[in-house]
Amino acid sequence: MKNFNLCRGLQLLLSKRKNASRSCSFFHLRSSSEISNKCRSFHDTSNTLKANVESKVKHKQPSTHQTKFMNPIVRELWEQRQRHGTKHEPNAEFKHPSHSKTTIDYNFKSNEFLREAYQSPGGTMRFGKVLEDLDALAGNIAHHHVAGYGEDRLMLVTAAVDRIALRNIPVLENDQRLSGQVTFVGSSSMEIRMQIHELSGDDNNEKPEHWLEGYFTFVAVNPETNRPVKICPLIPKTSEERAVFELGSLKAAAKKAARKKGIGNGKPLTEEAIKMESRAEQLMNDAFPLLRMPSLADPNAILMVHTQMQNCMIAQPQVRNLSNKIFGGFLMRRAFELAFAACYSFGGEWPQMLEVDNITFNAPVNVGDLLQFNSKVIYSLPDGGDLGAEVKKHPSKPLVMIEVECYVMEPEIARANLSNRFYFTFVLPTKETCRKVLPGSLEDARRVVQRMNADEKQAGLGKGYLRQYDLDSQ
């Protein structure tokens, strides 16, 4: 009715002014009949849009048209993947790690547009964009590995990111090289090691030292049945390839054993889980004054709930991948940016990224989904603790661990589903201490202990590389 009244009003207005002018300068119409035609067209368009919206609300089916993500590196990687998909790959019984090795260069010296796109307020590379590129290149490598083996139709999904460790985040004065290759393959999953190093004139003469390393896990599934699909086996050749393959095998076995034992799901079934439960109860004892007698509580402590931050967004079609789902790298970037803001607000100074501790992808995100990102400081180490002792040159600097959860909201049925969970570790480079974060419930305390336990295990596994972060380089 609103649309009809608007059009009728325009007809009357034009009729009153017909002696002054035979045209309407705003609409460029010369007769009331043309207005009627425009109105009918407007009604048709409105009805079409309304039908589309209603269909979207009911079904949430994304378009099959593929769009290109605005990030220039990601766009180039997707174009490479599409070109590669049109080529015929010879059948292969197995592949070596070197077959999948892929590199892409950031030519910051010669490309001013690229330099501007990746520059942070501090003059370093924007780590959120780096996360997008890591996921995009890892996807290319995964597609390259499975090509020419087994089923022609399969879908590769990012299952997890184990850890992305940084030595530093460089300024944009020199070119950088992003590289990756498959390092371990199970039955239907593969692990891909990603690295970034600075380009210099002697890169061909010696092995460059990377400033970032991370491991992405991809799983191959049938797009119709969503069941795992067997992929091409990996045969390591060199001693280094064999060592990394063995490490990947150990990590895969540890994850499988943890799932069987129930570690991390709140069920104290083992001796380790019982110790974790005791540790959680101790955290609740520490939090008791804040919960019951806040005026007498430690002023250097704060409840976890008071560190929360949140934002929401609609998943747009411009950030979907080739499987018509929202690009995982984009979700990682949005989660990182919220985590950075939460740490900045908590610590009172510009934090510095130390590592991406863990990312799990529980469910895909569709175009049009309403996303809610929730962040909080899950725990802090005011004096750096045992983990902080491994921070290069700054053994006593406080560390802050941020958890970000991404929920897909469904207002039509008043439901929310957890899609992703992210963990980030930051360091406060000039602070001597920070407030201790304590849980407000036993459930939160258990999650804190689980995260602490995972971090301590990872620190022991990666000792000698993980958490060697040169703060003076920034």
Residue spans of the language-model regions?
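N-terminal mitochondrial targeting presequence
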Residues: 1-64
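HotDog/MaoC-like acyl-thioester-processing domains
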Residues: 43-85, 168-174, 183-269, 367, ...
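Short amphipathic
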Residues: 99-111, 305-316
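Active-site helix/loop of acyl-thioester processing domains in fatty-acid/polyketide metabolism
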Residues: 125-151, 327-349
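A cross-kingdom feature marking solvent-exposed beta-strand/loop segments within repeated
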Residues: 151-177, 202, 348-364, 369, ...
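Extended repeat-based solenoid scaffolds, especially LRR ectodomains
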Residues: 259-304
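Eukaryotic modular interaction domains in large regulatory/scaffold proteins
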Residues: 309-360
